[in-house]
């Protein structure tokens, strides 16, 4: 009887340790293909000799505005 109780408690402790130890781990992120960023403009699109547009760089992210808005506030007129 005691052996069954102790083995059950040991199993529950082992199960909790396994779950909690793997909870905070993240999978390793895949590294994207690193290309320099460039600003899109009509002149920045190079054309191959066949006439196809190429994009050797990725578009740069737009900078977010630093304006701060109070959530739920009504606009002032």
UniProtKB/Swiss-Prot annotation:
Task: Cite the GO molecular-function annotations of the record.
Answer: chemokine activity; G protein-coupled receptor binding; receptor ligand activity
Pfam families per the record?
GPR15L
This protein's GO cellular component annotations are: extracellular region; extracellular space
Keyword flag Metal-binding:
no
Instruction: Give a GO biological-process term.
Output: G protein-coupled receptor signaling pathway
Keyword terms, alphabetized? Antibiotic, Antimicrobial, Chemotaxis, Cytokine, Disulfide bond, Secreted, Signal
Query: Residues of the signal sequence?
Result: 1-24
Give the intrachain disulfide bonds: 37-60, 38-57
Top-rank taxon, per record:
Eukaryota
Main location (coarse class): secreted
Q: Where in the cell is it found?
A: Secreted
Q: How does it assemble?
A: Interacts with SUSD2; the interaction is direct.
Provide the function of this protein: Highly cationic protein that has multiple functions. Acts as a chemotactic factor that mediates lymphocytes recruitment to epithelia through binding and activation of the G-protein coupled receptor GPR15. May be a tumor suppressor; together with SUSD2 has a growth inhibitory effect on colon cancer cells which includes G1 cell cycle arrest. May regulate keratinocyte proliferation. In addition, through activation of Mas-related G protein-coupled receptors (MRGPRs) contributes to pruritogenesis by activating itch-selective sensory neurons and mast cells degranulation.
Name this protein carries in UniProt: Protein GPR15LG
């Amino acid at each position: 009887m005691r052996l069954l109780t102790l083995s059950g408690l040991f199993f529950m402790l082992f199960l909790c340790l396994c779950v909690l130890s793997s909870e905070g781990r993240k999978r390793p992120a895949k590294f994207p293909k690193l290309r320099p960023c460039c600003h899109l403009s009509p002149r920045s699109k190079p054309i191959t000799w066949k006439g196809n547009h190429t994009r050797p760089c990725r578009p740069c992210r737009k900078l977010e505005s630093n304006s701060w808005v109070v959530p739920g506030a009504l606009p002032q007129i």
